[in-house]
Amino acid sequence: MANCEFSPVSGDKPCCRLSRRAQVCLGVCLLVLLILVVVVAVVLPRWRQQWSGSGTTSRFPETVLARCVKYTEVHPEMRHVDCQSVWDAFKGAFISKYPCNITEEDYQPLVKLGTQTVPCNKTLLWSRIKDLAHQFTQVQRDMFTLEDMLLGYLADDLTWCGEFNTFEINYQSCPDWRKDCSNNPVSVFWKTVSRRFAETACGVVHVMLNGSRSKIFDKNSTFGSVEVHNLQPEKVQALEAWVIHGGREDSRDLCQDPTIKELESIISKRNIRFFCKNIYRPDKFLQCVKNPEDSSCLSGI
């Protein structure tokens, strides 16, 4: 006990006192411990796992709310929708949850709030040819892609994810579906709403496919892995594929492509009829949608 000096004591008084050197050492240790606690308390909550994908789109909450308000103003049938409730449900699907463990169930409250019905024969699916599909529905106003519906419109071209066990949105990085995980907030959202969109389709459903790709029908696309398998045979009489050619000189019959035949087989096995049409000139196709009575539209497009 080299650091203790004994002296007569009574009662509960300490039997020894620390030397000045030991007191200084103890004080320094306590100070270092306090600094470490402060550093951990400040830095740890700010630490974020680095994902391979880009972070949440800037001003994500404001963008979603603004889009919701705009959509409900333009579409009278959706004016009953409370956009704050929509945002709360959207946020609740991913905030504080591990970004690689999101489920379709997480999005069900949002799906219920955004329920819409597309008239029969008016559903347009698409795969790898988004821009032309949207140009088409802008002209043919009585047909609808998923992005023409409330939920698809809210999330179109946006990225989002949260921080596990916090209420923060991660604007630095989000999981990439190839490099990190497929059960991320964005991928699961589109899988969920695409499934619902296909389930509610009826009559003749159309799909626009990109004929310039090596796989015109890709089983791994959202259309090939989700929508095709969720068309309801009791409601859908036929699927009509529009294969869009990539150039004026391409005169091939792409409806005979092996991947299109694969699509036909999948659809036929589900007791849904299948039709296919080549669209050789997409520019003329859109022009003829605008002006169907034009004499040039009487010839093939």
From Swiss-Prot:
Activity regulation, per record: ATP inhibits the cADPR hydrolyzing activity.
Extracellular side, ranges: 44-301
Glycosylation sites: 101, 121, 210, 220
Topology in membrane: Single-pass type II membrane protein
Catalytic activity: NAD(+) = cyclic ADP-beta-D-ribose + nicotinamide + H(+); 2'-phospho-cyclic ADP-ribose + nicotinate = nicotinate-adenine dinucleotide phosphate; NAD(+) + H2O = ADP-D-ribose + nicotinamide + H(+); nicotinate + NADP(+) = nicotinate-adenine dinucleotide phosphate + nicotinamide
Main localization category: other
One GO BP annotation of this record: negative regulation of apoptotic process
Transmembrane stretches, start-end: 22-43
InterPro entries found in the cross-reference section: ADP-ribosyl_cyclase
Location within or outside the cell: Cell surface; Membrane
Entry keyword Disulfide bond: yes
Protein EC: 3.2.2.-, 3.2.2.6, 2.4.99.20
Stretches in topological domain Cytoplasmic: 1-21
GO molecular function, one term: NAD+ nucleosidase activity, cyclic ADP-ribose generating
Family from the record: Belongs to the ADP-ribosyl cyclase family.
Cited function: Synthesizes cyclic ADP-ribose (cADPR), a second messenger for glucose-induced insulin secretion. Synthesizes the Ca(2+) mobilizer nicotinate-adenine dinucleotide phosphate, NAADP(+), from 2'-phospho-cADPR and nicotinic acid, as well as from NADP(+) and nicotinic acid. Also has cADPR hydrolase activity.
Assembly: Homodimer.
Protein name as it appears in the record: ADP-ribosyl cyclase/cyclic ADP-ribose hydrolase 1
Protein species of origin: Macaca fascicularis (Crab-eating macaque)
Gene: CD38
